[in-house]
From Swiss-Prot:
Function: Converts acetolactate into acetoin.
A Pfam family annotated for this UniProt entry: AAL_decarboxy
EC number from the UniProt entry: 4.1.1.5
Record keywords, A-Z: Acetoin biosynthesis, Decarboxylase, Lyase
GO molecular function: acetolactate decarboxylase activity
Pathway: Polyol metabolism; (R,R)-butane-2,3-diol biosynthesis; (R,R)-butane-2,3-diol from pyruvate: step 2/3
Record bears the keyword Lyase: yes
PANTHER family assigned: ALPHA-ACETOLACTATE DECARBOXYLASE
SUPFAM superfamilies xrefs: AF0104/ALDC/Ptd012-like
Family, per entry: Belongs to the alpha-acetolactate decarboxylase family.
Protein name in the entry: Alpha-acetolactate decarboxylase
Top-rank taxon: Bacteria
Species, as recorded: Methylococcus capsulatus (strain ATCC 33009 / NCIMB 11132 / Bath)
Catalyzed reactions per annotation: (2S)-2-acetolactate + H(+) = (R)-acetoin + CO2
Length: 260
């Protein structure tokens, strides 16, 4: 059986049971977001949400830090900062974020796939299987990675450049033959500019020493857990940079370049 057929079967089973969207009766299960990806694209790199505050909304997710100081990964209630050296550091609760997405991870769908699969194949398999592309999916993948390519972003100085310029000189790292976890989301197309439409995924190795924003990979022995919700809540900063930013422009091309 192909992996997309296994995903389809897994989603269908939980649809029939009636627990796909509300695991264990959690009617208020939601994805929480601080600020927008559009603001980040415009160089709004300072927010007013602390990681201590963010942790009250979720134990699983991704984002960044004020001054765009690296990539963030939240896994099992622990927050990690991937700095420009590619290494993972613990995040103090006083640190602040200009953009982050979290949820209280409570998956209903699990798929185990032993065979090799790459990033494009994985996206295609999930896209074919999801019962709707108009809701929100939090995705955790624990696997052996034969190869993975990630990036991070270096701390910026004011005046902040747009994110697309930062991404053109981002540090990239390639690793092989290691175990780790993918932490990510699939957002609907209609959310482009609020978030990244489609997939946005970060990586943390099993030893919790390195990671980054995922650009490509080949993995095997994958255990895929998916949390589905129809609820999304966002808070935007009350600081001047966000309030004064021009967020009316169409940023599809810039988002695609910066995130891929």
């Amino acid at each position: 059986m192909a992996i997309d057929d296994i995903f389809i079967q897994a989603f269908r089973t939980h649809q029939q049971k009636g627990d796909l969207f509300h695991p264990l009766g959690h009617e208020d299960h939601e994805v929480f977001q601080s600020s927008t990806i559009g603001a980040l694209m415009e160089g709004v790199y300072d927010g007013d949400t602390t990681y201590g505050e963010l942790a009250r909304h979720g134990d699983f997710g991704l984002g960044t830090f004020n001054a765009l100081d690296g990539e963030m990964i939240a896994l099992g209630g622990r927050f990690f900062q991937i700095k420009s050296d590619g290494k993972a550091y613990p995040v103090p609760p006083t640190a602040k974020t200009p953009f982050a997405v979290v949820t209280l991870f409570d998956p209903t769908v699990q798929v185990v796939w032993p065979d090799p699969i790459d990033w494009k194949q994985f996206q295609a398999a999930v896209d074919k299987a999801v019962p709707s592309k108009n809701v929100f999916y939090a995705i955790r993948v624990r696997a052996c990675f034969d190869h993975i390519r990630v990036r991070t972003v270096p701390r910026q100085r004011k005046p902040y450049p747009p994110l697309v310029e930062v991404a053109r000189r981002q540090p990239e790292f390639e690793y092989g033959h290691l175990e780790g976890t993918l932490v990510g989301f699939r957002f609907p197309d209609y959310t482009q500019g609020v978030n990244v439409a489609g997939y946005h995924v970060h990586f943390l190795d099993k030893a919790e020493t390195l990671g980054g924003h995922v650009l490509d990979f080949s993995m095997r022995n994958a255990v895929v857990d998916i949390d589905v919700t129809s609820q999304f809540r966002m808070e935007v900063p009350e600081c001047g940079a966000f309030l004064d930013a021009d967020l009316a422009r169409n940023q599809d091309e810039a988002i695609h370049e910066a995130e891929n």
